[in-house]
Structures are given as C-alpha cells and as structure tokens.
A protein has these predicted regions:
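Short beta-strand-centered segments that line the small-molecule binding cleft or hinge
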Residues: 1-29, 33
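Hydrophobic hinge/microswitch elements
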Residues: 1-4, 10-11, 73, 77-122
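Short beta-strand->loop
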Residues: 20-30, 116-131
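Alpha-helical segments flanking ligand/cofactor-binding loops in enzyme cores
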Residues: 22, 48, 95-96
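Residues embedded in well-ordered beta-strands
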Residues: 30-32, 38, 54, 104, ...
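Short helix-loop capping/hinge motifs at secondary-structure junctions, enriched
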Residues: 36-46, 142-149
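Secondary-structure junction motif
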Residues: 55-76, 145-146, 162
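A late-sequence structural motif
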Residues: 124-162
Length: 162
C-alpha cells in the first residue's frame, strides 16, 4: 500500500483487489532421490509407499510445502502421516542433504534440471499425486507500463529457459 514496489513475482492463490495479477509460470513439484539411493530402482511409488519413505522437506510456511500439503489433503493424507526426517530452509540445502542420504525430497522440477542432466538425481512419480503451482507477476492496478512492463515482456520471452 505504500507504493514502494513496482513489480513482484508471487506464488499462491491469495488475491487483493487493488493489485493486478498476471500469470507468468506454471511449476511442478516432483519427488526426487539421489541416484545412489536404494529408491533409485523405483520409477513410481504409491501414496501408501510414500508414507513409509523417509522425507526431507521445505520448512513450514514455504510455498513448496504448502503445495504438498494441499495435494496430500485431496487424498486425506496429513503431513503427520508421512515419515519426515527433516525440514530444511532452502532448495539447495535439500539437494545437498539428499546427496548423502536415503531420503526423498519434494522440489520444483525447475530447481533440479542441472542435477537431472548430470545424473545426480532421479524423479520418482507418485501415483495419483499432482503438485502444480502458479507464479504471477503482481503490480498495482493501473501501473502496467514503463520498466515493469518491459521486464515482464523480457521474462515472458525467456521463461522457457528457466
């Protein structure tokens, strides 16, 4: 409300009437394991198997964890039903942790492209669990010109490389 930020990139479904939301990017969360993990031999696990797998997840309040909670809720599964070994505060810390553990992580597919390409991690499908989220540009209503508009054009042009 103090007009200090011309443009923001946000995740989530919260909407305020004085702000303009422009869809930018869809992201998928996936289950990953290190290729030295015993879970490497699996291509897909069930929701019941997910309850038994040791997990390392993002911290409470993170958008990533919120998307997981929402997806699990659709199947009447709570976080407390899972075998959570640890909550960590960043994507990079989860990736480092997974390199030396038998745990599974839930992260954005976009955050692990390099590791998938190098063969460090493998994506495991979780049968019937869909985890997508949207990112939107946000700006004050009527403030859709100038440098913010130019940046949005630039970002939209190059978003497939993200």
């Amino acid at each position: 409300q103090e007009h200090r930020i011309d443009l923001a990139l946000v995740e989530g479904n919260t909407r305020q009437p004085n702000l303009k939301y422009t869809p930018f990017l869809q992201d998928e969360l996936v289950a990953i394991v290190h290729t030295h993990s015993k879970w490497m031999d699996y291509d897909e696990i069930t929701l019941d198997e997910l309850k038994e797998v040791p997990l390392v997840l993002r911290e409470r309040g993170s958008g990533t964890l919120d998307v997981l909670i929402t997806a699990l809720h659709k199947h009447n599964i709570k976080l407390s039903d899972l075998t959570i070994r640890m909550h960590l505060g960043s994507t990079e810390s989860i990736k480092l942790f997974l390199e030396n553990s038998e745990c599974m992580g839930i992260l954005s597919i976009r955050s692990i492209n390099k590791e998938l390409y190098s063969g460090k991690f493998k994506v495991l499908d979780i049968k019937d669990l869909v985890m997508f989220r949207e990112f939107d540009f946000v700006q004050l209503q009527g403030q859709d010109t100038g440098l913010p508009a130019l940046f949005m054009q630039f970002a939209n042009h190059y978003k497939e490389k993200l």
